[in-house]
Regions:
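ATP-dependent helicase/translocase motor core
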Residues: 1-177
């Protein structure tokens, strides 16, 4: 219930699949299109279903849409959509939802100077943090880009810089394993 009348005059829509959590709340909504159709055609429809489920259960589900050959994930509270090679497990989806509230701002992280303490290393780590996170329109934390590229000379401490970035990502709850 709760579909826009412009989309469906009855206000009732039928989602293809809802993946439920152990707490009875929706973890994910899956919109499945025919194999001959572009999977992206299901994006808007899946978003509408997610809106309805969020209203009904007070938890925004992660959005998946697929045609059987291409599959996409979209955690629209944090990142833009991206193609994936397979579906996530129940625990993996629950972790994505849990991270919405437990993630810390990378830009305020104090780097362990025992790992990477040179000024240019600290500047590189700061730039990576700024590249990965932005402030949402509503003041919440949002993901910006999912990747960063550092170009550093031989002997400048690339490994230590990378280790400090991994330390930052894990301690701020952005990554579990690297």
């Amino acid at each position: 219930k709760g579909m826009p009348k412009s989309t469906n005059p009855s206000g009732i829509g039928y989602v293809d699949y809802v993946l439920w959590g152990k707490d009875g709340k929706p973890l994910a909504v899956v919109e499945a299109k025919r194999t001959m159709a572009d999977a992206r055609k299901g994006r808007h429809q899946a978003e509408l279903y997610a809106d309805c489920l969020e209203t009904m259960h007070a938890q925004r589900p992660v959005i998946f849409y697929t045609n059987g050959f291409e599959s996409f994930i979209w955690d629209d509270t944090f990142y833009t959509d991206r193609e994936i090679q397979g579906f996530y497990t129940q625990d993996e989806i629950q972790l994505l939802i849990d991270r919405r509230t437990t993630r810390k701002d990378l830009r305020t992280f104090k780097v362990n100077k025992d790992i990477a303490g040179r000024d240019y290393q600290l500047e590189a780590i700061k730039r990576v943090a700024e590249n990965l996170v932005i402030d949402g329109k509503d003041g919440t934390l949002r993901g910006a880009k999912r990747e960063s590229l550092l170009v550093m000379a031989t002997g400048s401490g690339k490994t230590r810089t990378a280790a400090a970035i991994v330390d930052m990502l894990t301690k701020c709850n952005w990554a579990k394993r690297v």
